[in-house]
Amino acid sequence: MKIRPLNDKLIVERQEVENKSEGGIVLTSQSVKKSNRGKVIAVGLGKRFENGERAAMEVKVGDQIIFNDGYGVKTEKIDGAEYLILSESDVLAIVE
């Protein structure tokens, strides 16, 4: 299935967090916090203004990002894989 985000939305694949502590202890899934880093899979065309123009998107496909994993972030399963749908405003940084 192909998915195309609208407006200023992004499709992101969450990066997994390592399940070992710094001391080498294997952590249970309950004690491992979900990562707020991911890889951008798809990007919308940008937010549309009332005059019909669109804001240019700063985030591009393939970017590694740090995002705010808050209320506006939606989780969807697509072809058995889990993806996040979020707004560009939820992106805190691009990792270079």
Swiss-Prot record:
* Entry keyword set: Chaperone, Cytoplasm
Protein name per the record: Co-chaperonin GroES 2
Just give the chief location class.
cytoplasm
Protein origin, superkingdom: Bacteria
* Signal peptide per UniProt: none
Location comes to:
Cytoplasm
Task: Give the organism, scientific name.
Answer: Vibrio parahaemolyticus serotype O3:K6 (strain RIMD 2210633)
| GO molecular function annotations of the record | ATP binding; metal ion binding; protein folding chaperone; protein-folding chaperone binding; unfolded protein binding
